[in-house]
Design a protein with these regions (language model features):
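Cleft-lining beta-strand/loop regions that shape enzyme active-site pockets
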Residues: 40
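Short, ligand-facing micro-motifs at secondary-structure edges
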Residues: 27, 46-58, 76-100, 114-119, ...
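Active-site PLP-lysine loop of aminotransferase-like
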Residues: 108
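A structural connector/turn signal
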Residues: 65-66, 93, 137
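Non-catalytic DNA-recognition/assembly elements of restriction-modification systems
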Residues: 1-23, 149
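Sequence-specific dsDNA recognition surfaces
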Residues: 13-28, 43-73
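A short glycine-rich beta-alpha junction/loop motif
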Residues: 96-104, 112-115, 135-151
C-alpha cells in the first residue's frame, strides 16, 4: 500500500515521445512495393497485436527517407482516427516496421517499462478516457497533443 501512496502521476507527454505517422505528401500508394519493409496501418491494429495480412511495404530507400517513422521494440501504435482507443505493442518480431499517417506512435522513455504502459492503455478506464478526449462526432480522432494529456 505504501507504494501506491508514493506513486507519481505523469502526463504521457512527459514520459514518452508521441509521433504522428507520415503525411500523404511524404508517402504515396505508388511508393508501395511487393517486397520491403511492412507499414502498419489502422487496419493492422488487431486485438493487441498486429494483423499481418495485406501489409503495404516500402523500399529500403523510402525506409531511410522516412526513418523517423520506423518502429522499435517497446513502441505502442494507436489508431489516430476511428477506433482511437485501439493500440498494438511492437514486439521483437515487428521491430523495424513502419507506421502510417493514420496512426500515432508512443515511444516510452528509458525510465518507463513499455509493457506496463501498454497494459495501462489496455485498461477499460484508460480506453474510455482516450475515447472521451477524441474530437469529431462522425469520425473520432486524436492527435499527439490530445494523447499527451493522458495521465
Amino acid at each position: 500500500m505504501d507504494r501506491m501512496v508514493n506513486m507519481n502521476i505523469h502526463f504521457l507527454r512527459d514520459i514518452a515521445d508521441i509521433q504522428t505517422g507520415p503525411f500523404g505528401s511524404q508517402l504515396h500508394k505508388e511508393d508501395y512495393v511487393d517486397f520491403g519493409t511492412p507499414i502498419v496501418t489502422v487496419e493492422h491494429l488487431g486485438n493487441r497485436v498486429f494483423t499481418e495480412q495485406n501489409l503495404p511495404k516500402v523500399s529500403d530507400e523510402d525506409k531511410i527517407r522516412l526513418s523517423k517513422y520506423v518502429l522499435k521494440e517497446g513502441d505502442i501504435v494507436f489508431s489516430r482516427v476511428g477506433s482511437v482507443d485501439r493500440c498494438s505493442y511492437v514486439d521483437a518480431a515487428h521491430d523495424g516496421w513502419m507506421f502510417s499517417g493514420r496512426c500515432l506512435r508512443v515511444r516510452p522513455n528509458a525510465e518507463v517499462d513499455p509493457l506496463y504502459l501498454y497494459y495501462f492503455f489496455c485498461l477499460e478506464d484508460t480506453k474510455q478516457f482516450v475515447r472521451n478526449i477524441a474530437v469529431g462526432v462522425t469520425m473520432p480522432s486524436i492527435n499527439t497533443k490530445l494523447l499527451g494529456e493522458v495521465e
